[in-house]
Amino acid sequence: MVKVIQIATAQDVGRVLNPIAALGQIEGGIAQGLGLAVMEEIVLDNGKMRNPSFTDYLLPTALDAPQVIAVMIEEPEPQAPLGAKGIGEPPCISVTPAIAAAIRNATGRDLPRVPIRPQDICL
């Protein structure tokens, strides 16, 4: 499996109401995107799920979490309460293609699907 060691992100977070919680939301979104990129896969065999439990269905844990460098750009949203914006969703959406692009750049392999499995990148 691919080991992601560092992810850097910059995000417009509106007005930060709680910096620690905001960073936690960014890190959580990154973990979800990481899972989608290299871990989470439903395996079916003749229509039957072969990995129906968390024992078999891989999810990222704290041990899989990369170092996160996060820059929070504060541009308050005038129409939102206290100027806040959603924080956890954007990294989840952007991290998956960023990891796929990094693997493609490192290997030169066409990677038409996620999650990217070891057999997809073995040379």
Spans of features found by a protein language model:
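C-terminal catalytic domains of large/alpha subunits in multi-subunit enzymes
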Residues: 1-123
